[in-house]
Amino acid sequence: MKKTLLALTLLCTAASLLHAEKLVIKGSDTIGAKLVPQLAEEYKAQHPDVSFEIAAEGSTTGITAIIDGTAQIGMASRPTKATEVSAAAAKGVTFKETIIAFDGIAVIVNGGNAVSSLTKKQIEQIFSGDVTDWSAVGGKPGPISIYTRNTSSGTYSEFKELAMSKRDYAGSSQKLAGNEQIAAEVGKNPNGIGYVGLAYLGASGVKAVGVDGAVPTSANVQAKKYPFARPLYYYTNGTPAGEAARFVEFTLSPTGQQTVSKVGFVAIK
C-alpha cells in the first residue's frame, strides 16, 4: 500500500512538473524592480505551478528580448522605436503593445535643498548643462550634480523627449542603472538632482520638486496636470498565449490594477 501511495505521489509530482511553466519577463527597471515582482507574487499564490524569471535591466533589453525570443513579456517605459519594429519584422516578430499603468517622471533633489519648484525651461537647462550652479535657479551656491538613467533605460529617452526638447544630457551627468540607485545618490549629495518614477518617491533623503507648479502625484498624473507623465507597457510577440496571456490579464484585472496603485503608479481603470 505504501509503495502504491509513493508511486502515485511521484506520478503526481512528475505530472505537475510537466505542466509547470516558467514565465520570463525582461525589461524596464521602473516596472520590473517593484511592480512586476509584486504582481508575480500575487499571481503565484493563485497559480503555484508557475515560476517567474524577472530581469529589470532597462526597456531596451525587454524589447530586444521579444525580438530575440528570450522572454514572453517585455517591460518598457517607452514605446518601441522604428528601428526596433524593423528589426522585429526581419525576424517575423510583430509587437503587441499593452498599456498596464501610467507614471510620472519625478524630478528629485536632496531633501536639504531649498529649491522646491522648477520651470520646464530650468529643468532643460540643468540637465543639458546650460545651468551648472544652484544659485541660478534660486538655491544656495553649489555645483549641480546630475544623475540620470543609463542609455538602455526607457526613462532615459522619455525624459529627453518630455523635459529636454530632445537635447543631449550634460557631459558631466552620471549614468546609473535604476531608480533606486538615482534616489540613493541624490539622497547622499546635497547638490544632487535626478529623476525617478512615482513608485520610488518614498526614498530616504530626497524630495520631488514641482514642475511649473505641478507636483508629481498620482492625482496630477491622472488629471493630466503633470507634464512629465507617460504610459508603462508590456510588449509581446503578437497576441500572448498561455501563461503569458493569463498574467497580462491578471495585471489588467481589478486585483492587478489595485496592486499598480498600491505600488505607487496610476491605474489605467
Protein language model annotation of sequence segments:
Residues 4-13:
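Sec-dependent N-terminal signal peptides
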Residues 13-20:
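Sec/Tat signal peptide C-region and signal peptidase I cleavage site
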Residues 20-269:
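Exported/periplasmic ABC-transporter solute-binding proteins
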